[in-house]
Amino acid sequence: MLGLSQEAVDFQQRGFRGASVFMRNRLENVGGAFLAGYHLALECDSPEDLGSKLTEVELERRGVAFEGAAMGLALLDFLTPWRRDRISQFLRGAGDSHTYMIHVGVGWVWARIPFGFRRWQKKLDPLLGWLAFDGWGFHEGFFHWPKYIAGQPPPKKLKGYERRSFDQGFGRSLWFVNGGNIELIAQTISNCSADRQSDLWSGIGLAATYAGIVSETSLGELREKAGEFQPQLAQGAAFAAKARQRAGNLTDYTSLATKILCGLPAVDAARLTDAALENLRADSNVPAYEIWRRRIQNHFTPARQLQKT
């Protein structure tokens, strides 16, 4: 009853466009890893057993399997009010090194059961909890892309910065919807309202770096297409490098992507995100998560354009 079929990530079924045969196979395999993790979470009896099974997934796609597992665990937490500790247990154990992906995976459940999510957020990491809204945005962009690229805003339930986090995830989904086709991606974002484009480019930077895989030439084209949003693109790429570095699944492609999009090797891009956490505090209007993002973006921004942090 709770299963998700392979058709859920089939590009033809989803109506996605722009992908070469290679990219379609590549991105469908990424989706397949998510489904594998999701179903493992429903089948395994303990977080330890789940963690052990997830380590059998190919290293490059293992983080996505952890993301899918997080959706499964979060769904079980929701369905069993007498036991709502699966996500927290997983984060304390086998899921610790994949904490970024797990927070994103929780958001898939929020997208499907969109109530009580603010109570859920309070149980997540105070900084990374915003990634669940990112996961919500990815889910909506992936499964309902026609209405969102036609201009539908984030759900009315979302307020304030929740809407921006949603758009960061929606931006990630555009990498899949457009099959990694740089021209289509740029065109899709340019058709969105101007106040959303910076967050969409941030999401693209993350997806292009984490999920890939395109050529060095295509990455250079992506950077040029981002134009004034190159700092946001680079910040997303740095986030991807950090997620992979913490999980121990950096690849040669990760470094290629960060070299082009950030001007840094992957390990240095990941280190930059750590440095940006120093003395990080929220203010009355801006979440600490957004201040963190801005600090990273400022590293890639000419001095005259620096944002206050």
Question: What feature does the model see in each segment?
Answer:
Residues 1-309:
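Mature, well-folded catalytic/scaffold domains that follow N-terminal targeting or propeptide regions
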